Amino acid sequence: MKTKNIMIVGVGGQGTLLTSRVLGGIIQEAGYDVKLSEVHGMAQRGGSVVTFVRYGEKVYEPIVEEGQADVLIAFEKLEAMRYAHFLKKDGVLIVNDQRMDPMTVVTGAMKYPENILETLSERFKVVSVDAMAEAKKLGNARVFNTIIIGVAAKSMDFPKEQWLEVIEKTVPPKTIDINKKAFLTGYSI
């Protein structure tokens, strides 16, 4: 099997690290070699968080090079735009249709770009989901990242039941049920 590359990007506190642990868990249970790497900017202050997940028969390096990501999972539209250059030409971008204004926009120093999803759709296959709205329907906005995991799971070759088992092992015990519901919501989108 050729090495597969996944990037997860978001803003501090959005659950990118949990998402990478779930992905790493499912891949490892399937018997592949997996490497995870995290880059924290000013994450605690709403800055970018990037995680890399690489897997295959044998993986030596945890970092995904520009233009090599098979899948880019973005928890926010601007983060999708910021890291889209990591995607392969035939890569898939899974993006949460959410806007979080960075400090430069809040202070008025810059404007938030318009038509991000349309621009990205010109270059890549884009799967857009309003995971926050779906999470609010479930009564817990914090599980929007698990909804995105469900969306991403459809493009990977691992059984749904195995995903649910890994989620159960990974999330805090008191959140298992809501996270399973969130995953199934994303999986059905």
Model-derived regions, located:
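Active-site cofactor/cluster-binding pocket
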Residues: 1-189
